[in-house]
Amino acid sequence: MDVKILTLKKWIDESDNVVFFGGAGVSTESGIPDFRSVDGLYNQKYKYPPETILSHTFFTRYPEEYYKFHREKLVVENVKPNAAHLKLAELERQGKLKAVVTQNIDGLHQAAGSKKVLELHGSILRSYCSSCHRPYPADKMNHGEGVPKCICGGVIRPDIVLYEEPLDDRIVNEAIKCISEADVLIIGGTSLNVYPAAGLINYYRGNKLALVNLSSTPYDSEADLVINEKIGKVFSQI
């Protein structure tokens, strides 16, 4: 086993206060495309730039165009948790992992069995009326046709954070609390270029910061351990 992975395993074995902060790279091994890589959503050609489509203004003005993109690109069928999701759920059951803080919207951490999951950007598995806030099952939104409407006449929207929208203060504050109190902070599958989410790791006060990502990140120099490898491969060895 790689000496760096051995070090990470030792940190986890000796701790009962581990927090995991993850991004799109955690789910790519389950077949969900990321956003910013060469093959990611943001580097593909559409009628409008994906960053524009995934904005509050665009959703409000052109909900039909939004939902075409949503159903074609954001909804991925028959995906299952991978080795990273499963190991994190196992570590939580063992009393070692205190929380998963994720930028992902796919619900795979919960599907793997994780209980304490702080979804910074919401979930594609939930939806609600943009007018009266009545909650709705995601099926109508993800698999229907046209623009889904509430019984009040309002447009049903996904429970995700679009561009131009703030993060949920309650979730952010809980994430800050978990990160600031963590003994070991593992950051995985994220380029750490998305703010304000990436800025949350600045609240970590410990000396066991591990970065697991295929490519380099702006925080590599601040980490105590950097592993440039697929996160599923790393977690399958822990």
Positions of PLM-derived features:
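Conserved catalytic core of sirtuin-type NAD+-dependent deacylases
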Residues: 1-238
